[in-house]
Amino acid sequence: MQRSLVGSEMCIRDRYQAVPKADKLEQIIQKSVELGVTRIVPVLTRRCISRPKPAECQKKLPRLQKIAASAAKQAGRGIIPEVAPMLTFAQACAEMQQADRAILLYEGGGVRFDEADLHDCRSIALIVGSEGGFDPEEAEQLQQNGAVAVWLGHRILRCETAPLAAISIVMHRTGNL
């Protein structure tokens, strides 16, 4: 059976991921690409347990990009998503405003995911914390910059699990699942 390649029908353009510890970023990239994210952006936040130097992150980029390429091929995607260089929190706040909608997964509250307005969104930026979540001041700053805080219910999900649930919800709500 011949499969056609899937283009960029997914509307989650960017996934801003606070830097997790160890090799979790590799799994995060792989699964996000399989689900249709176009770009993964590591971000250094206050509660990141892992605090790599920019040069260390730059050195890992080719390997992370290979993981993205492999996941794209496995998923039959027509494009290879980008793994961007690590950004500071301030850089991520400024950059995420380019999306039609920015969604902050926040364990500290917000609207239920099914209440978030996704109508007429051609691009969504998904913002995800590390193992320690977001500092309340960072969450406030993200919201002041236009992010809508959403929560996934009463369970506290791991930093590598919560975004997969969120991406799946967005895919379903936008007709891509």
Label each residue range with its predicted role:
Residues 1-7, 12:
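Single conserved hydrophobic/aromatic residue that forms the stacking wall/gate
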Residues 16, 41, 84, 101-103, ...:
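Hydrophobic/aromatic beta-strand patches that form the interior of the parallel beta-sheet core
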Residues 121-141:
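A C-terminal functional module that forms or caps the active site or interfaces directly
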Residues 136-177:
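Structured adenosyl-cofactor binding patch, chiefly the S-adenosyl-L-methionine
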